[in-house]
Amino acid sequence: YECGPLQRLKVKRQWAEAYGSGNDREEFGHFIWTHVFKDAPSARDLFKRVRGDNIHTPAFRAHATRVLGGLDMCIALLDDEGVLNTQLAHLASQHSSRGVSAAQYDVVEHSVMMGVEHEIGQNVFDKDAWQACLDVITGGIQGN
């Protein structure tokens, strides 16, 4: 699958519907992180500084908001590759010392896709476009 111009536009549109249409963003983030930690309980250890042990704390909720804000920016930049690559390099520098495995990025990708599908409905969700475009984003954050 590719993250070409049409896929990028579709992902941007579906993300705007799931994340940016007045839905409760905190609830959306809670849905995603609940699934991340259900699928990869050991990932909580990566979030000790922001209370990954309890996703209901203000510290973790603030972190979840920052993560979704960063993802929102990356998705918005999907059709501006030069600026996207600069943003991904910045995120890569923030994540390189954190010890996040490729498998853990996959869990986050899957949880984000579940969250978007949950919000917009399975009949319109384009899994192939999301997989390809999230691979571009997480690959960039991993420095690939």
From Swiss-Prot:
UniProt-recorded Gene Ontology molecular function terms: heme binding; iron ion binding; oxygen binding; oxygen carrier activity
Record keywords: Heme, Iron, Metal-binding, Oxygen transport, Transport
Globin domain ranges (all copies): 2-144
Record carries keyword Iron: yes
Pfam families hit by this protein: Globin (PF00042)
Top-level division of the source organism's lineage: Eukaryota
GO cellular component, one term: hemoglobin complex
Gene3D superfamilies named among the record's database cross-references: Globins
Keyword Transport found: yes
Binding site for heme b: H95
Alphabetized InterPro entries for the sequence: Erythrocruorin, Globin, Globin-like_OT, Globin-like_sf, Globin/Proto, Haemoglobin_extracell, Mb-like_M
Family according to the record: Belongs to the globin family.
Subunit details: Giant hemoglobin is composed of four heme-containing chains (AI to AIV), and two linker chains (AV and AVI).
Protein name, UniProt field: Giant hemoglobin AIII chain
